[in-house]
Amino acid sequence: MSQSSAEAPVTTATGPLVIKLGGEVVGGPALAILSSDLAALTRAGARAIVVHGGGAQATRLQERLGIPVRQVAGQRVTDADTLDVMKMVVAGKLNVDLCAALVAAGARPVGLHGASGPALSAVKRPPQVYAGAGPEPVDLGLVGDITGVDRGLLELLGSGGYLPVLACLGAGADGQAYNINADTVANRVAIELGAAGLFLVSDVPGVLRDVADPASRIPSLTVAEGRALIASGAVTRGMIPKLEESFAALAEGVRRIHILGRLKPGDLAREASEPGSIGTVLVP
């Protein structure tokens, strides 16, 4: 009997797969599909690490609690109350919900956050100038820049057949926790572990020539082609920082990066074995 695409062998001899799940995915109806696909990948022999965010859910809880939501250039300004919300939502509810869904699908997840190990060492980001936010440096508060990834911890879990599930919070040497963008975490983990592929899964089906037309998905992009799209204005808004961070990760050795979303069963494994078949694959 031939194997289904979800169970087809996926080779990661050159490095693990890093899969970043946006909060809209972790908290949405596609979670069961993704959990099943991730479990199938690990059963097929793939080494994988999951990174997740939770910005949309954190925003909703802040609004319910009456905590102001401020963003600068897509970055969440994080005071002490906002950081507590991120801990509750991202390292708490969403990490547990994702791990529970993976257990139900047959995987062996281990939920982690930056202070676990610490898996993600960080320092406070100094004030800096952000595009569109005026000429003066802006202090984002308790937002961190990654200074280290505990590669040994993540590889130890993977070698034991476990699936690390990492929430996007970092920890400083002084015990201070920091909010970190999930795309940034995923890119850095992929770089540090020499990932065979990085998958950025959200509700966007890939890089589109026309944001209003899902059929305009671009299967494959080089860095030069991606920069030309940005310069032409075809790529806008949140896709620009996603592409810019991806370009930097490719320059530092990540072999390929996949941008995809709205997945059906088996799509994740298919994209891993047939790059560009489901989303957009970025290559150097």
UniProtKB/Swiss-Prot annotation:
Top-level enzyme category: transferase
Marked site (Transition state stabilizer) residue numbers: 20, 242
EC numbers for this chain: 2.7.2.8
UniProt binding sites for substrate: 54-55, 76, 179
Top-level taxon in the UniProt lineage: Bacteria
Gene this protein is translated from: argB
GO terms for biological process, alphabetical: arginine biosynthetic process via ornithine; L-arginine biosynthetic process
Family stated for the protein in its record: Belongs to the acetylglutamate kinase family. ArgB subfamily.
Catalyzed chemical reaction(s): N-acetyl-L-glutamate + ATP = N-acetyl-L-glutamyl 5-phosphate + ADP
Listed pathway(s): Amino-acid biosynthesis; L-arginine biosynthesis; N(2)-acetyl-L-ornithine from L-glutamate: step 2/4
Name listed for the protein in its UniProt record: Acetylglutamate kinase
Lineage, broadest ranks: Bacteria, Pseudomonadati, Myxococcota, Polyangia, Polyangiales
Gene Ontology MF annotations: acetylglutamate kinase activity; ATP binding
